[in-house]
Amino acid sequence: MPSMDIVSEVDEVELRNAVDNSVRELKSRFDFRGKDASIEYKDHVVTLSAEDDFQCQQLVDILRMQLSKRNVDPASMDVDDKSVHSGKTFSLKVRFKEGIEVLTAKKLVKIIKDSKLKVQSSIQGDSVRVTGKKRDDLQAVMTLARESGLDQPFQFNNFRD
């Protein structure tokens, strides 16, 4: 009986590569020459700091673009609403969503059940296990999860026949 897990995780290596590429782009951008701006990555949190709020938003855009180039879904970013002002720098913290929260998992299971596909889904910690009789049903669930609009990127692993 085919089964798979629906998870939400960020590839640590690709995230680090995207941050490194963002730092490289920051150093080469003309509008940041002579400005005090930085991008730092530590403990799954990216800290963006610049001299004003507008530049912080530009740093978010640079990071978002580099993430999409490295095939990391920018929807997994959780950016602070307001930048923190300390001294003469503004800083933003960007966290990345890992795992599926219980509320989101319940919504996903409800969407799967409402689709009338012949599959069973169950919540297992921070993932959702889906089993069905046909591989085609699981592929339909993959499409359904991607198009669900739950503000969270999903990956599919442990695909077994």
Curated annotation (Swiss-Prot):
Keywords: Nucleotide-binding. The keyword Nucleotide-binding applies. GO terms for molecular function: nucleotide binding. InterPro entries: DUF520 (IPR007551), UPF0234-like_C (IPR035571), UPF0234_N (IPR035570), YajQ-like_sf (IPR036183). It comes from the Bacteria. SUPFAM superfamilies: YajQ-like. GO terms for cellular component: cytosol. Belongs to the YajQ family. PANTHER family: UPF0234 PROTEIN YAJQ. Nucleotide-binding protein. This is Nucleotide-binding protein Swoo_3646. It comes from Shewanella woodyi (strain ATCC 51908 / MS32). The lineage of its organism: Bacteria, Pseudomonadati, Pseudomonadota, Gammaproteobacteria, Alteromonadales.
